[in-house]
């Protein structure tokens, strides 16, 4: 394993020939998948700096997605080793990982797909209370990106990450989002809940959907006054009887009844 990392890690560079970095990243991901935790512990101090260095400067989407999956695997298989690592300047790995997340959130939406979501949740699960000092900024960044997201993969990824935090830290998350104002004056909580209730059922993976349902239950139990007057789309309203509708026209016409957000949560549950 160490020899393979010695071969692949130097290829994670923006200076190598086109196609080399994504190939090396894919190989690293494949090796991490089949390696057991004990083997991975021996290469964290060598592999993590190479992976992190590329992710802080690299632009290749394919390479970045493979490396996000690699980091998720490291977080799951040897969390104490990766979170306990420091660089030569005594910078903790968590600080480096948060810089990576910040950079990825500033990049094109196609970078923030399923691999990004799995990386985020794996890190959230293992870092736990270590994230407390940066949670306000992290939540703000995630919801701000969600507010601008147009691609389904990016939207569902951000919703999944936020749902995980809601499911496991509901009281703190609700309080922080309610106190965070986004551009335009709307609270981050209202923005998140509106988008969440609109798109959550597009989730098709059973375990992710279960996480969403757990999170929605937690949200309902921590309902706040700021959500009392939030109305969202409910059922599709029937077309007027006097209008002849073709299939395409009916789809374009679709209008929804407006229902309280709390009612929509109960319907989803």
Model-derived features: where do they sit?
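Karyopherin-beta/Importin-beta family HEAT-repeat alpha-solenoid scaffold
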Residues: 1-269
């Amino acid at each position: 394993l160490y020899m393979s990392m010695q071969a692949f890690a130097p290829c994670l560079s923006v200076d190598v020939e086109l196609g080399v970095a994504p190939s090396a990243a894919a190989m690293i991901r494949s090796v991490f998948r089949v390696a057991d935790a004990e083997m991975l512990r021996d290469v964290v101090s060598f592999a993590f700096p190479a992976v992190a260095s590329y992710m802080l400067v690299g632009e290749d989407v394919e390479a970045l997605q493979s490396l996000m999956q690699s980091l998720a695997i490291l977080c799951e298989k040897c969390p104490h080793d990766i979170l306990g690592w420091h660089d030569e300047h005594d910078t903790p790995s968590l600080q480096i990982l948060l810089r990576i997340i910040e950079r990825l959130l500033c990049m094109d939406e196609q970078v923030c797909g399923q691999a990004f979501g799995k990386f985020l949740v794996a890190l959230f699960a293992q870092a736990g209370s270590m994230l407390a000092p940066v949670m306000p900024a992290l939540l703000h960044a995630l919801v701000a990106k969600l507010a601008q997201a147009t691609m389904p993969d990016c939207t569902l990824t951000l919703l999944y990450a936020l749902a995980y935090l809601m499911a496991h830290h509901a009281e703190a998350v609700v309080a922080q989002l309610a106190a965070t104002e986004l551009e335009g004056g709307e609270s981050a909580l209202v923005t998140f809940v509106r988008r969440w209730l609109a798109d959550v059922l597009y989730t098709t993976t059973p375990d992710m959907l279960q996480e969403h349902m757990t999170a929605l239950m937690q949200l309902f139990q921590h309902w706040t006054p700021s959500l009392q007057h939030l109305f969202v789309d409910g059922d599709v309203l029937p077309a007027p009887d006097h209008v002849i509708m073709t299939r395409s026209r009916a789809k374009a016409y679709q209008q929804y009844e407006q229902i309280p957000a709390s009612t929509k949560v109960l319907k989803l549950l």
